[in-house]
Amino acid sequence: MGSSPQSSTRTLLGLLFLLLVQLSSALKFDLHASSGHNERCIRNFVFKDQLVVVTAIVSGQRGDGQVVNMHIKDALGNDHGRPKDIAGETRQAFTSVADTAFDVCFENKLVSHHGVANPYKSVELDVEIGADARDWSSVQAAEKLKPVETDLRRIEEMVAEIVNEMEYLRAREQKLRDTNESTNERVKWFAFGTMGMLVGLGVWQVVYLRAYFRYVDFPVSWRVDGVVANCCSCCEQVEASYLRSSRVVFWSPLVMWTRLSWLILR
């Protein structure tokens, strides 16, 4: 006995929904009380114009010596809610203004011990973003949609969110690639310029030293047996050559490069 087309369609939609739906599970943790300002934050990312619904369930009750405050903020400095002294279930909804990360922060202030050695409260947090945050029951009732049509609408929005996320990742990857290529290009030309400058400085130094030794021309003669001849007679000439070369040494390439580097680094 064959299955009906409606049953096959429901099965196909159910499988597609399981493939596309984002797995969301509530986060549960213990928030210990303290007298100072000690926040515990959970971060998530949201795209522009997406609906975000934050649901927090805090154990205990008001007036038990612990005050739990919640603060929702994004990386751009916008505040999306500051409920104070929450207990039980608390819901906060907002629409993002840009592609950014947002934090859901909790703090548990200790007012009085009430005989408890290590007071704390349990927090169960559930964050729904985009298609998961919409109330599809109200959408179905308002637009008079069939269950299959409602599932198709939800899957359509989830696919659109996935496409937008892929487009965002592609644009970000392209931006990072362009930055990497431009940095590589600047480093390459800087290396070529440094090598050319060093080669030019070396050639300049060789030419300078060659002209320098020709200009000094020390008149010292050597005998075959290694004893210096005419040493005393040439001392005055060596001193005069040194004094004449002092002006040339001042314009030495190495001296000029050292002074220029010192001025730059200073």
Swiss-Prot record:
Q: What does the record list as GO biological process?
A: endoplasmic reticulum to Golgi vesicle-mediated transport; Golgi organization; intracellular protein transport
Q: Where is the GOLD domain?
A: 39-129
What the entry lists under Pfam families is as follows:
EMP24_GP25L (PF01105)
Where in the cell is the protein located? Endoplasmic reticulum membrane; Golgi apparatus membrane
Per the UniProt topology annotation, the Lumenal ranges are: 27-188
Describe its membrane topology.
Answer: Single-pass type I membrane protein
Q: Which GO terms describe its cellular component?
A: COPII-coated ER to Golgi transport vesicle; endoplasmic reticulum; endoplasmic reticulum membrane; endoplasmic reticulum-Golgi intermediate compartment; Golgi apparatus; Golgi membrane
Q: Where would one find the signal peptide in this protein?
A: 1-26
**Keywords, A to Z?**
Endoplasmic reticulum, ER-Golgi transport, Golgi apparatus, Membrane, Protein transport, Signal, Transmembrane, Transmembrane helix, Transport
| Covalent S-S links between cysteines | none
Report if keyword Signal is assigned. Answer: yes
Q: What InterPro entries does the entry give?
A: Emp24-like, GOLD_dom
Q: Any transmembrane segments, and where?
A: 189-209
* Cytoplasmic-facing ranges: 210-266
What is the role of the protein in this entry?
Constituent of COPII-coated endoplasmic reticulum-derived transport vesicles. Required for efficient transport of a subset of secretory proteins to the Golgi. Facilitates retrograde transport from the Golgi to the endoplasmic reticulum.
Q: Which family does it belong to?
A: Belongs to the EMP24/GP25L family.
User: What protein is this chain from?
Assistant: Endoplasmic reticulum vesicle protein 25
Species this protein is from: Aspergillus fumigatus (strain ATCC MYA-4609 / CBS 101355 / FGSC A1100 / Af293) (Neosartorya fumigata)
Corresponding gene?
A: erv25
